[in-house]
From Swiss-Prot:
First-tier enzyme category under EC: transferase
Catalysed reactions, semicolon-separated: RNA(n+1) + phosphate = RNA(n) + a ribonucleoside 5'-diphosphate
Cellular localisation: Cytoplasm
Binding site for Mg(2+): D490, D496
Name used for this protein in its record: Polyribonucleotide nucleotidyltransferase
Cofactor(s) the protein requires to work: Mg(2+)
Length: 714
């Protein structure tokens, strides 16, 4: 019944297996990939015809982690998987980015790639497995795909690169100082197509070495997919790339001069209007048949790209008048918003971000329900890209994939310089509002995020800056690397290469390649040029940091204390009675962790001290030999009970009240009376033994034997 094809190989410490022919046989391509006990199914389907008038490539990549894969039931009211999580969205983008450029140019039929996590061993991250499964499914589906690709994850420990570190190793690099890199690389047999990373101030050489190492490690996987496809691939879809050379010639003849003049305008808005006018003039000169051609958009883009690229490669001149290495003018300001905890406005040319930092308590941490466990995150970065930032009218609503991806890139860049949670026990939320955009808005978020956190008083290890690099690569091998690219240069160029870091090294690298043939030499030049740009931006940012506040007066103060774990129950009390009383009396917010760390938060220092003292009185143990001030709570025939240490009571035996015989303790004591007592010790049953007679009741000083004898002699 089943015609199953299976291929396996040893990859690092695990076995990688590809299988097809048993599940989802009606899909154009279906592959189940297994690494260890992590298993992902990828299914590919594509339309046989292009929709009329469609002038773009409608590729959709969907990635979903099923809770049953890890033996879990989804949370929430409905108890089923719902909208994509951040991890699912980022993984879908991770798969989309390297495969999109590899479809045959001109192919615009709808393609759907669906990756479903079926099993997760909590060791091997399913994102890499999904990428390999998707590549294999595309390769056998018959769709015009110039792959395959493969991907891997690389760590960096003690100067050594590590292939596919475990999920636990990559959970939080701040808590694992030995692990300095989380890098994902995807590529073909000949070229690197995509890089995504989070690093702890690696040098350019270390980062380039990691990418090179990763590309070498994916070669056996590419070979495995090729041999797998040789046994089970379907017949290639009959597709001939469209020939629109005549249409392009007509477009070029009708408006090259006007389009070239439009691209000579340095102001973005004026240039955009002039380019739009040139397009309309070209369309007006074309025939109805040419206007109806579905490749008109491609012909116009080819004309625009030729003008922009030719000027850069041949003359070294960019559309805004800069050379290839110059960063646009920068203005950095902090402390703009009076009631926020920290704020910054970062402007670079026609790209601008208003970035705001808010400091919260442990209650504000983000709870994440993932396949590999539940955990909390105390650093959040949200990126918003409203339509007005590019002068357009558009959809306003929940963040899209692009906004989530850009926010995570900025998050990775800043994560490396954050203080340890034990040193700075705040939840940090950074929001980047992109108010203007003409390229590299994610890197503006990095710069603005660094400034706003410093304005809020977050003790960052160093300021972080980011810059977006571009590439123009011609067919003859000539190329130009561009620093701080514009939106048009990103759209019409061959590479988007974002680098963020400190003065000491790189904290984040993201690269997307639109063409094959990116050599190590080009990558090395791009990294070197990016470092120069980063240093320039950091110098400009430092001009704004001199006025940064030490700590926002509007932010809550947090003090931490450690208590024994066996005392947690006493602090909470039956049904939470004790902790509620502490919060009500002190006015502070109190968070208790399972490890005994307590965070006390309040804008008022007196409130924090009151809560601290109340907790300390519950958990602290009285010391033998110390003198305490207490209050008589009960009088009995054989002595008096004194509350002397928090809620702790002890017995002052009648013989320990005074240096004379008493008929009854009530002769000298009454309930509510304040007395000073010395802790003599504990009896066999753990009961507290106190003494009043060895303490001067006026001064609180202990009466030593010499003083006692002298007083008796008098």
């Amino acid at each position: 019944m089943f015609d199953v094809t299976t291929k396996s190989m040893q990859w690092g410490e695990e076995t990688l297996t590809l299988e097809s022919g048993k599940i989802a046989r009606q899909a154009d391509g279906s592959v189940v990939a297994t690494l260890g006990e992590t298993r992902v199914m990828a299914n590919v389907t594509f339309a046989r015809e292009q929709k009329p008038g469609q002038d773009f490539f409608p590729l959709t990549v969907h990635y979903q982690e099923k809770y049953y894969a890890a033996g879990k039931v989804p949370g929430g009211f409905f108890k089923r998987e719902a909208r994509p999580t951040e991890k699912e969205t980022l993984t879908a983008r991770l798969i989309d980015r390297p495969i999109r450029p590899l479809f045959v140019p001109g192919f615009k039929n709808e393609v759907l790639v669906m990756c479903t996590v079926l099993s997760h061993d909590l060791v091997n991250d399913p994102d890499i497995v999904a990428m390999i499964a998707a590549s294999a499914a595309l390769t056998i589906s018959g769709v015009p795909f110039m792959g395959p690709i493969a991907g891997c994850r690389v760590g960096y420990v003690d100067g050594e690169y590590v292939l596919n570190p475990t999920v636990d190793d990559m959970q939080d690099l701040r808590l694992n100082p030995e692990q300095r890199l989380d890098l994902v690389v995807a590529g073909t047999k000949d070229a690197v197509m995509m890089v995504e990373s989070e690093a702890y101030e690696l040098t350019e050489a270390e980062m380039l070495g990691a990418v090179t190492f990763a590309h070498a490690q994916i070669q056996p996987v590419v070979d495995l997919i090729v041999s797998f496809a040789e046994q089970c691939a379907k017949e290639p879809f009959d597709f001939t790339p469209p020939d629109y050379s005549d249409l392009y010639a007509a477009v070029k003849a009708a408006g090259e001069e006007q389009m070239r003049a439009a691209f000579a305008i340095t102001d973005k808005q004026e240039r955009t209007a002039a380019v739009a006018a040139a397009r309309e003039a070209i369309k007006a000169a074309l025939t109805e048949e040419q206007l109806a051609d579905g490749n008109l958009g491609s012909a116009l883009k080819k004309l625009e790209a030729g003008i922009l690229r030719g000027d850069v490669v041949k003359g070294g001149k960019r559309i805004d008048g800069r050379d290839t290495t110059t960063v646009r003018p920068i203005v950095a300001e902090t402390g703009l918003l009076p009631r926020t905890h920290g704020s910054a406005l970062f402007t670079r040319g026609e790209t601008q971000g208003l970035v705001v930092t808010t400091l919260g308590t442990g209650d504000d941490e983000q709870f994440i329900d993932a396949l590999h466990g539940n955990f909390k995150s105390n650093f959040l970065l949200h990126y918003n890209f409203p339509p007005y930032s590019v002068g357009e009218v558009g959809r306003v609503g929940s963040p899209g994939r692009r906004e989530i991806g850009h926010g995570k890139l900025a998050w990775r860049a800043l994560q490396a310089v954050l203080p340890a949670p034990t040193d700075f026990p705040y939840t940090i939320r950074v929001v980047s509002e992109i108010t203007e955009s003409n390229g590299s808005s994610s890197m503006a978020s990095v710069c603005g995020g660094s400034l706003s956190m410093m304005d809020a008083g977050v003790p960052l290890k160093s300021a972080v800056a980011g810059v977006a690099m571009g590439l123009i690569l011609e067919d003859d091998g000539s190329y130009a690397v561009l620093t701080d690219i514009l939106g048009d240069e990103d759209h019409l160029g061959d590479m988007d290469f974002k680098v963020a870091g400190t003065e000491n090294g790189i904290t984040s690298l993201q690269m997307d390649i639109k063409v094959a043939g990116i050599t190590p030499e080009i990558m090395e030049k791009a990294l070197s040029q990016a470092k120069d740009g980063r240093m320039h931006i950091l110098a400009e940012m430092n001009k704004a940091l001199s006025g940064a506040a030490d700590f926002s007066v509007h932010a809550p103060r947090i003090e931490t204390m450690q208590i024994p774990t066996d005392k947690i129950r006493e602090v909470i009390g039956s049904g939470g009675k004790v902790i509620r009383e502490i919060v009500e009396v002190s006015g502070a917010k109190v968070d208790i962790n399972d490890d005994g760390i307590i965070k006390i938060a309040s804008p008022n220092g007196d409130s924090i001290k009151k809560a601290y003292d109340m907790i300390w009185s519950i958990v602290a143990e009285p010391e033998e030999g110390q003198v305490y001030t207490g209050k008589v709570v009960k009088i009995v025939d054989f002595g008096a009970f004194v509350n002397f240490f928090g809620k702790r009571d002890g017995l002052v035996h009648v013989s320990q009240i005074e240096n004379r015989r008493l008929n009854h303790p009530s002769d000298v004591l009454k309930e509510g009376q304040e007395v000073k007592v010395k802790l003599l010790g504990f009896d066999d049953r753990g009961k507290v033994r106190l003494s009043m007679k060895v303490v001067d009741q006026e001064t609180g000083e202990e009466i030593v034997p010499e003083k006692k004898e002298a007083s008796e002699a008098e």
